[in-house]
């Protein structure tokens, strides 16, 4: 099986349209990358943590018996995005799996974190450097929801705290919490590949001994066996499962424990907040690029 990558370099205000366009044409995934080697610094109020120039990459799966007409696809894209630079490349499976290593650079998240590919040296040795090899699991710091969660963790007192990372993906949030002093992190994801990636990334950062990660059923058994409740919970998934999980999260977090939810777009904030207000005090709603939002607050004093 082969893969086709279409790389389109656009301005910040064209990202949403370009991403939607690529997905509507059958892309199996879309990624965003810095086009001009800019640091992703902590934004001022009203600003967004997205680069001015962005490479939007659509990934298409090619069937050997029905190959994609690349020129026809590019012609259509160029009609929708006139005078916009774009290029394509076709990758075999083995090359595609690690192709991003050729151009992946450290990413600065605010002023506290650097996300550093495992094969590169950290740009700032004294910063909180998260070594990462996400493979195909979600969560590299590029996406707005991951940024919002990292930003929140960086401002939260995690010293000697018990933390839950629900929907851990690559493990980036679990690792960040441990590097910031969490006593223990319990992480879970429905994807076995994410569980493996989280273990590998925790090992890369020398924090594996303070991490438990498993599929949800395994996680539930392990966490209940611990006899504790979490001081902090972070969940970067989607609005629908977040609303379904609200009663369960209320049992996992101790009274006055802190939480942050992401993977929510602006239009979903009211619905999610309404469900969570039954169990939690909503203290802050933070909005970032392309309408992605974070809801944070504390568990009610009485369980």
Swiss-Prot record:
It comes from the Bacteria. Its EC number is 2.1.1.-. One of its GO terms (biological process) is methylation. It catalyses: L-lysyl-[protein] + 3 S-adenosyl-L-methionine = N(6),N(6),N(6)-trimethyl-L-lysyl-[protein] + 3 S-adenosyl-L-homocysteine + 3 H(+). Keywords: Cytoplasm, Methyltransferase, S-adenosyl-L-methionine, Transferase. GO terms for molecular function: protein-lysine N-methyltransferase activity. InterPro entries: Ribosomal_L11_MeTrfase_PrmA (IPR050078), Ribosomal_PrmA_MeTrfase (IPR004498), SAM-dependent_MTases_sf (IPR029063). S-adenosyl-L-methionine binds at residues 146, 167, 189, 236. GO terms for cellular component: cytosol. Signal peptide: none annotated. It is found in: Cytoplasm. Belongs to the methyltransferase superfamily. PrmA family. Methylates ribosomal protein L11. NCBIfam families: prmA. This is Ribosomal protein L11 methyltransferase. It comes from Acinetobacter baylyi (strain ATCC 33305 / BD413 / ADP1).
